Amino acid sequence: MQADILDGKQKRVNLNSKRLVNCNQVDVNQLVPIKYKWAWEHYLNGCANNWLPTEISMGKDIELWKSNVLSEDERRVILLNLGFFSTAESLVGNNIVLAIFKHVTNPEARQYLLRQAFEEAVHTHTFLYICESLGLDEKEIFNAYNERASIKAKDDFQMEITGKVLDPNFRTDSVEGLQEFIKNLVGYYIIMEGIFFYSGFVMILSFHRQNKMVGIGEQYQYILRDETIHLNFGVDLINGIKEENPEIWTTELQQEIIEMIQRAVDLEIDYARDCLPRGILGLRASMFIDYVQHIADRRLERIGLKPIYHTKNPFPWMSETIDLNKEKNFFETRVTEYQHAASLTW
């Protein structure tokens, strides 16, 4: 053997030794062999959706916002929607970087988490771009989670879920610790991204369906496509951890998760009532009661729990929008051509 060749073959990763959490014996820096193909597929799908908000024209939105066409109630919906999303994406990004990434010990899952964290940064950039374009008070929008009770209540709820996992002494190598980690994943993937965000998408995309605020609507369609992948990854991660650690999925944990989701539904309904005190064309607060309960049931089912509300979807067009997003070529609507690495100059 040549002197400069090390005998390190025994450190090559065995596929069957990989686990999603609590796997210190496997080198997390070695991506291959890939065991969790779903994680890699989510990463590839995310990379196929590269975009920046500045690639989308806001000209028509600016013109409409400065006109008298939008009612005060319509403006209220848009402003409170931006007030929630502007910091919510940062909360999700911080939880990925500071809480989830540390405790996920699988490289292909981590690869997607890095991609997701970047996307959360792009989403936060999006809300700044919208505020700047419309000439809104950026400080008021980005501080809404401290000034608006319905928004603060949702974000405080999310921060409660993060607290224990952010503790430097937190560990996942006990049943109780891993159960706490699962609750964190449910809080952010199922509740924040799977319930709170989807309710917010309905509000803005309903304007887009009426050919109003089309630039914002285009950006929200991008975000919706990202968030659909985020939700799918989160569901797969939760179910994967459950499968590898069946002892954690106790009746008590299941009941805790159901109660978390019930609380989230109540918070989202309060927020919808704040956004829509009188209702606007195509949207009423009462419709959001049904919608939030409907999607909560769908999220419960995806992690192996029974539905509890049994309400119908008052916005069937949202399902169509999600399906269309899988096929639509957003690149055709961009105002600037996407710069590939080969075209960059130094």
Swiss-Prot record:
UniProt key word Magnesium: no
Matches recorded under CDD domains: RNRR2
GO BP term, example: deoxyribonucleotide biosynthetic process
Function: Provides the precursors necessary for DNA synthesis. Catalyzes the biosynthesis of deoxyribonucleotides from the corresponding ribonucleotides.
EC number: 1.17.4.1
Organism the protein comes from: Chlamydia muridarum (strain MoPn / Nigg)
Similarity remark: Belongs to the ribonucleoside diphosphate reductase small chain family.
Active site per UniProt: 129
Subunit note: Tetramer of two alpha and two beta subunits.
UniProt-annotated binding residues for Fe cation 2: 120, 193, 227, 230
Cofactors (names): Fe cation
NCBIfam families hit by this protein: PRK07209.1, PRK09614.1-5
Lineage: Bacteria, Pseudomonadati, Chlamydiota, Chlamydiia, Chlamydiales
Keywords: Deoxyribonucleotide synthesis, Iron, Metal-binding, Oxidoreductase
Pfam families registered for this protein in UniProt: Ribonuc_red_sm (PF00268)
InterPro entries according to UniProt: Ferritin-like_SF, RNR-like, RNR_small, RNR_small_fam
Example GO molecular function: metal ion binding
Cofactor binding: number and manner: Binds 2 iron ions per subunit.
Protein name: Ribonucleoside-diphosphate reductase subunit beta
Record-listed Fe cation 1 binding positions: 89, 120, 123
Record's catalysed reaction(s): a 2'-deoxyribonucleoside 5'-diphosphate + [thioredoxin]-disulfide + H2O = a ribonucleoside 5'-diphosphate + [thioredoxin]-dithiol
Name of the gene this protein is made from: nrdB
